[in-house]
From Swiss-Prot:
SUPFAM superfamilies from the UniProt entry: HPr-like
Protein known as: Phosphocarrier protein HPr
Domain HPr: start-end pairs: 1-87
Residue positions where Phosphoserine is found in the record: 46
Family: Belongs to the HPr family.
Native species: Streptococcus equinus (Streptococcus bovis)
Length: 87
């Protein structure tokens, strides 16, 4: 299992557009990928799950991946987070 912590700097947090991009990125991988926020973990491949967390600016989240391509998945998600100005 691999995991990485992120501090959300985007003014709007993880709203619909970046959430969609994160879900699309995560869905490219076979690994199980979760987003943890305030003690609640959701499947990062589920737009409803990600949106239900209401992650705002200044939040600290952890993304974890478990599976054969976990490291590649985390690297791609980190790239998306950076490219979209989320973290």
């Amino acid at each position: 299992m691999a995991s990485k912590d992120f501090h959300i700097v985007a003014e709007t947090g993880i709203h619909a557009r970046p959430a969609t991009l994160l879900v699309q990125t995560a869905s490219k991988f076979a690994s199980d990928i979760t987003l943890d926020y305030k003690g609640k973990a959701v499947n990062l491949k589920s737009i409803m799950g990600v949106m239900s967390l209401g992650v705002g600016q200044g939040a600290d989240v952890t993304i974890s991946a478990e599976g054969a391509d976990a490291d590649d998945a985390l690297a791609a998600i980190e790239e998306t987070m950076t490219k979209e100005g989320l973290a």
